[in-house]
């Protein structure tokens, strides 16, 4: 299902949904960040997705990362909560979500890279290289907040 993101755009459609979601900032021993190329918006992103009923938020992180990348992970820290009502995601099925994203630092504990129906590439990329890719500004904010993390989560 394709989507269009709007940030601070008065032409954005009216919000009809809020779904808590997660992203994981995962770095390898070389400091590279685990990223995926999303099939729904054709952008590079952190692995993550929507919280399902009946699961803990930690289970959401683990499930989404495994589904989108093939890696097993454990959470280290909460690095940010993002609820900008001017960041709207419109899906082709008519759902129009307000952003509600919780970001976590995590580390791999197993698995290996594989793509999914939501990700056609899985790559470890430097922060500098991400600046050269098509990455949504909200993802860069989450990455930068995580890289600057000093013990207090960003609330934006």
Q: In which residue ranges do the predicted regions lie?
A:
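Short connector loops at helix/strand junctions that flank enzyme active sites
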Residues: 19, 41, 46, 73, ...
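A structural signal for short, well-ordered beta-strand segments
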Residues: 24, 78, 104-106
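Nudix hydrolase/Nudix homology domain
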Residues: 42-43, 112-156
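Active-site-adjacent beta-strand/loop module that shapes the phosphate/pyrophosphate-binding cleft
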Residues: 83-112
């Amino acid at each position: 299902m394709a989507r269009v993101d709007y940030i601070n755009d008065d032409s954005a459609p009216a919000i009809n949904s809020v779904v808590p979601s997660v992203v994981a900032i995962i770095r390898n021993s070389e400091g590279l960040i685990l990223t995926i190329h999303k099939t729904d918006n054709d952008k590079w992103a952190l692995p993550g997705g929507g919280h399902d009923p009946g699961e803990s938020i930690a289970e959401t992180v683990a499930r989404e990362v495994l589904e989108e990348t093939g890696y097993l992970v454990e959470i280290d820290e909460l690095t940010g909560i993002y609820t900008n009502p001017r960041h709207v995601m419109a899906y082709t099925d008519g759902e129009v979500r307000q952003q509600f994203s919780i970001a976590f630092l995590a580390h791999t504990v197993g698995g290996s890279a594989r793509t999914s129906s939501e990700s056609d590439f899985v790559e470890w990329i430097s922060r500098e290289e991400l600046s050269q890719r098509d990455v949504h500004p909200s993802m860069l904010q989450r990455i930068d907040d995580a890289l600057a993390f000093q013990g207090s989560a960003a609330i934006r």
